[in-house]
């Protein structure tokens, strides 16, 4: 017979080995761009930002004054024409630029909006860069959307003012990891956080 104390030691040893193996397997399963502290890094081979680059608000203002902002002729389309075109092509596939990174994309029966920003400026409060042109439509004028795509959480892409007032709460939302909470707390329920390289089937005709 095996001594009771020895048996307990053997069992503890085996459990310890199993636990270590589980931890190693868990770590190995994590993608390269996931760091242990829950943050992320760029894929291998990505350009590395120089540590010498520092943000200076004074330099930013100085360089900004050098930029000549001019708009091409007919760059801004009259809102009446925008509405007429959306109505005219409502049964067709189309891409309509609303402003900056905000696009309306219609594919079959699915209407998609990307990075919806309808606020006057990009920032947490009244501060932040102002728009150079107004969006082609107001938020309450866009057609019903079925899918909202958020690329990242910079202020000029994730606009909390727009998210709070977004009229179509049943829209399916796809966001990067850890950003779904901003939509859920504003009563948008169908929120899906996605990692790099992941795919999701939106409906029978569309996979993202």
Q: How should each PLM-predicted stretch be described?
A:
Residues 5-13:
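Sec-dependent signal peptide recognition
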Residues 105, 115, 152, 159, ...:
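Divalent metal-coordination and catalytic microenvironments
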